[in-house]
Amino acid sequence: MPHSLNVNYSFLSKFKKHVSSSVVLIACTILALIFANIPVVKEWYFSLWQHPMAVSVGGFNLFSHGGHSMNVMMVINDFLMAIFFLSVGLEIKREILVGELSSMKKALLPIIGACGGMLVPVLVFALFCPANAAMQRGLAIPMATDIAFSLGVLSVFKTRVPVSLKVFLAALAVADDLGGIIVIALFYSSDLSWLYLGLSALCVAVMIIANISKVRAKSFYLVVGLVLWYMMLNSGIHATISGVIVALCIPATLKKGTGHYLERIRMQISKFPVIDVDDLHKTVVLTHNEIHMLKSIESAADKMISPLQDLEDSLHGVINFFVIPLFAFANAGVDLSQMSIGGLFSGVGLAVMLGLVVGKFLGVFTFSWIAIKTKIVTLPAGISWNAFASVCVVCGIGFTVSMFIADLSYSALGEAGITLLNEAKLGVLCGSVISAVLGCVLLSRTLPKEDC
């Protein structure tokens, strides 16, 4: 029973967190498009991201790569997104340990759906994208499902959405993120430096040994993680992967059992003097001993939360209300004057859009349908096939990770890459909007009606 409560809390709390942040994300996306297309601020908007940044100590600059300072856009896409992937990694680790990916029975349907949702969009992209080596670099763009936007769509329907449907979508998005991380690590690394790779491995070894030695201080892992980020930045492996590695090394267990800390709290509370009813609304000056007891209770309560969950909770606000909105504001700005409508309906833009709208739905639904019909898994309780299909449409909302992979795919190709990147971004935006609107229409028709 406690485990069941844990899982429900995990997904329902995640649902509430992401739906509020999706509004901020939409606002920043719209602002980016406005700023990128209004002549008065357009030049300022695009030049803003090219300003060099430095965090220097003596002659050492943390934000440097290959001897050159990083600009604002690089810091957002390489450093802040590493923090985003740290959060994603913590989420994946928690779900594997105690959540919806903790057993094969629970994890199988979202994993099978995610596999289809990654494979088929790639095939659709390859089918509609011209056989050009530069264009084909974006094969992985339509693979991702944006958890904030997709859960935001479900939030529109409030209590009409069965919990099992929310759980499926959230678990699929987590599995999707894991697939995206693997793709980034394998296919977006280049010019490997064995020296920096060796130093990166040393950082990982230090964190693993610290975990085994029961080092529970989050600050230790974050400091070593910062060093790891710099080493990976210069190693040739994409630096954002460092966030996932740090997440996997952060302890998910307590130093002592929960019972030990609960008993300590109960003991201190029992010793605390009873406050007279008449004094409840008065300012009470505590003795040193009472302050010590309260601090002891606070310390024990803090130690009942594992470093993994504590850090995940602490990062929530930073990720959802700073990192992702800033990423959207920096990356969603597409100069529409440089593009034609025909550009969207050909080449990269069309391939990305169809990969998200058609590929995602076909992949998630078809793979899930086959698995259910062959009795490998079962359809989640309380869900009709029509409602399930509607949620598969919502899976085509691919924003954050899709935009990120688009940048990795085309940003290094010079002038030609800028055009392809803009087409890809527009494809992501259009595909995501179509999937969201279509998903809303279908869900409104297929979900159970609210009781009057």
For each of these PLM feature ranges, what is it?
Residues 95-123, 193-202, 338-359, 385-392, ...:
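Entry/N-cap segments of selected transmembrane alpha helices
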Residues 111-151, 159, 353-410, 430-448:
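Transmembrane alpha-helices that form the ion-translocation and gating core
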Residues 154-266:
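Functional cores that coordinate and move charged inorganic groups
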Residues 6-13, 86-102, 151-162, 205-216, ...:
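C-terminal ends of transmembrane helices
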Residues 2-17, 218-224, 242-381, 447-452:
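Predominantly late transmembrane helices and immediately cytosolic-facing juxtamembrane segments
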Residues 29-44, 331:
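Alpha-helical transmembrane segments of multi-pass membrane proteins
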Residues 74-85, 133-148, 189-202, 240, ...:
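Structural signature of hydrophobic alpha-helical transmembrane segments
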Residues 59-65, 69, 73-98, 318-339, ...:
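Hydrophobic transmembrane alpha-helices of secondary-active transporters
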